[in-house]
């Protein structure tokens, strides 16, 4: 289960600097899952939240994990309403995850450019257990189209997208 646009409040102190979160402008995403996974699996996932045109906006996109023939996790969230998207494709230069990415949807309703700022990469290979992860944080810009045809212009929305391959 993934929940977007969860209002955040509070503060965090890192390296002597205080960061304050305001519920009007700051949001979090909850990612919670359970189940039985295959030994060898790969998924692509991205999520982000912010304010667009003065209203809460979020998205959840992904594929590669599980059977999505009946349903997928691709959604827009705008002003408290969910908007279903068709299939999304992540276009990534896997030789360099810090190069810009693009995202396209089969229905044309999620067309974005992504400029990475940080690749939280991890790779472990102990033969029986393998993980190769690139959780990349950056800025998303482009267009998102709501169910009623309203086009939202997205500019520099901080978010993340990941490419994860596990064997365990």
Predicted region positions:
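Structured soluble/peripheral alpha/beta segments that form catalytic or ligand/cofactor-binding pockets
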Residues: 1-168
């Amino acid at each position: 289960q993934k929940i977007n646009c969860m209002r955040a409040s509070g503060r965090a102190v890192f390296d002597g600097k205080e960061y304050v979160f305001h519920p009007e402008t700051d949001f979090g995403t909850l990612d919670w899952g359970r189940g039985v996974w295959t030994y060898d699996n790969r998924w692509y996932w991205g999520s982000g939240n912010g304010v667009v045109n003065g209203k809460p906006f979020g998205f959840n996109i992904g594929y590669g994990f599980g059977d999505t023939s009946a349903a997928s996790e691709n959604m827009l969230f705008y002003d408290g309403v969910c908007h279903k998207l068709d299939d999304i494709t992540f276009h990534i230069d896997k030789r360099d995850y810090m190069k810009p990415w693009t995202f396209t949807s089969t229905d044309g309703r999620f067309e974005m450019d992504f400029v990475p700022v940080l690749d939280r990469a991890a790779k472990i290979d102990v033969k029986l257990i393998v993980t190769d992860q690139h959780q990349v944080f950056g800025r998303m810009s482009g267009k998102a189209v709501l169910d009623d045809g309203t086009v939202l212009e997205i500019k520099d929305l901080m978010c993340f997208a990941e490419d994860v391959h596990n064997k365990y």
